[in-house]
From Swiss-Prot:
Lineage of source species: Bacteria, Bacillati, Bacillota, Bacilli, Lactobacillales
Keyword RNA-binding: yes
One Gene Ontology cellular component annotation held by this UniProt entry: ribosome
Protein name (record): Large ribosomal subunit protein uL4
Gene Ontology BP, a term: translation
Length: 207
């Protein structure tokens, strides 16, 4: 079992936390992480691109000139693709780019990124993040006390709204619950700040 230092909100070390090696101590599988990140980024695409094909362009119902006898090339519609103002051939249509990977793959990717953060000493465990009211300044003090000045993902337990509200105006700070944090969220962060309760939730979800 790997041990990480456990801090309180003032930055004081209070004890250590034992981490499950099956989740936080595996050999990271970079290939699987790559596949999951690509999948999650694809799902974020809006996919609302659209152009008009010849059936969608207004007009063009009448044959522009008779089939034979004019000396010109035969034409059936002024909205054919070769005409200026005509429809687009095989253009983009609205669609979803999202696709799902097997659950085992997604879980392995999560274990890989958590293990990588622990191995790189970018995993900061805190006893709790409790605030009497949403205060950005108070959350900034916590980050300063823990010497966190880079892009950080804060993982909290479900229902800790004050922590999320306190952090949302801070640059380079993102907040997610332990059960919903994605591989993309974790990869995008330089450090993880995780509450003790959130660690238990992660171990329950990925056990």
């Amino acid at each position: 079992m790997a041990n990480v230092k456990l801090f309180d909100q003032t930055g004081k070390e209070v004890s250590t936390v034992e981490l499950n090696d099956d989740i936080f101590g595996i050999e990271p599988n970079e290939s699987v992480v790559f596949d999951v990140v690509i999948s999650q980024r694809a799902s974020l695409r809006q996919g609302t691109h659209a152009v008009k094909n010849r059936s969608a362009v207004s007009g063009g119902g009448r044959k522009p000139w008779r089939q034979k006898g004019t000396g010109r090339a035969r034409q059936g519609s002024i909205r054919s693709p070769q005409w200026r103002g005509g429809g687009v051939v095989f253009g983009p249509t609205p669609r979803s780019y999202g696709y799902k990977l097997p659950q085992k793959v997604r879980r392995l990717a999560l274990k890989s990124v958590y293990s990588a953060k622990v191995a790189e000493d970018k995993f900061v465990a805190v006893e709790s993040l409790s605030f009497a009211a949403p205060k950005t300044a108070e959350f900034a003090k916590v980050l300063s006390a823990l010497s966190i000045d880079t892009k950080v993902l804060v993982l909290v337990e479900e229902g800790n709204e004050f922590a999320a509200l306190s952090a949302r105006n801070l640059p380079n700070v993102a907040v997610a619950t332990a059960a919903t944090a994605s591989v993309l969220d974790i990869v995008n962060a330089d450090k993880l700040l995780v509450t003790k309760e959130a660690i238990s939730t992660i171990e329950e979800v990925l056990a």
